[in-house]
Amino acid sequence: QGKDHAIFSGDTLFLGDVGRPDLAQKAAHMTQEDLAGTLFDSLRTKIMPLADHITVYPAHGAGSACGKNMMKETVDSLGNQKKMNYALRADMTKEEFIKEVTDGLMPPPKYFPLNVKMNKEGYEDFDKVLERGIKPLSPEAFEAAANETEAIVLDVRHQSDFVKGFVPRSIFIGLDGSFAPWVGALIADVKQPILLIAPQGREEEAITRLSRVGFDHTIGYLEGGFDAWKASGKEVDQIHSISAAEAIERIEQNNQAVFDVRNTPEYLSEHVLSAETAPLDALNDHLSSFPSEGDFLVHCAGGYRSVIASSILKSRGIHNLIDVAGGFKSLQESGAKTSDYVCPSTL
């Protein structure tokens, strides 16, 4: 009794990181550097003086775009965070803090300001969102809904299943990767109607996770999943996927074009020597870069983002792509020639 036990640190302190100062709803005269300075003051005067035994419960964890490099753990002691969180170094000056916290910030996802608006003005009850979304549609009804509405067909299966066969022009963003962040980054409007193709039994999970980032307009799902679509005899598409070893052979013997869809810091840190950068979150800006004749290779770090990119390119009518299974990690392990490694913190 009377003893501090825990702190709910919100977006101020994360595990291994602190909140992004560029996301705050700020006055017009305040820069992100000003807000970073205010964050420094809050940490130093409100949180760091607390006892080391206190448990920290942050509002976000690994994978969230609200920070740069959060730990995968969900709770920790404040004492441990004081030891290992770069932003809580005891000898850190305010100027050093501002520089480190604002350095390398990627643009915030497009849905962030839309979510802020929803939080201020209110949003639909989730029971209604789920009732509308958890509507099973036969392949015929699903196809009709896709043709008659402006819905995106979103396939949330595993990437290894998607590449083997999918509904033409559907977009892949798998539940087993960074699902919500990529939905938010790639689908511009939170009011966009969505038709789902999900693994059996995970339809409600998909609708729920979409809703958590403001995408409340799922209008149904394909009953029986992709297998039902295929069994009905409807048109299917595939993504040509090859091993890293075969990709290296194509690069070295045929000088095949390579596109790296990782983010810019990842690419600058180390990349396949002949690869061009085409970050997934800016893919539409690079459409003219992809060759119209001859095959080209697409890879990311491990194979998730490259399949997202491939599905987007195919939906835009670009079909001469080949996905590299396992991504940059497999290319490295298979002996691909790469640029010299540069520590990301020095970029």
Label the predicted regions.
Residues Q1-I7, E131, K135, A141:
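Core dinuclear metal-dependent hydrolase active-site scaffold
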Residues I7, A151, Q256:
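Hydrophobic "anchor" residues on beta-strands that sit immediately upstream
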Residues D11, D155, G303:
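Conserved G/P- and acidic residue-centered "switch" motifs that form tight phosphate/ATP-binding loops
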Residues R20-D22, H29, E33, N80-K117, ...:
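Rhodanese-like catalytic fold shared by cysteine-dependent sulfurtransferases
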Residues P58-A62, K68-N69, L114-V116, D155-H158, ...:
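Short, well-ordered beta-to-alpha junction loops that form the rim of enzyme active sites
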Residues I134-A144, I152, H158-Q159:
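Protease-associated
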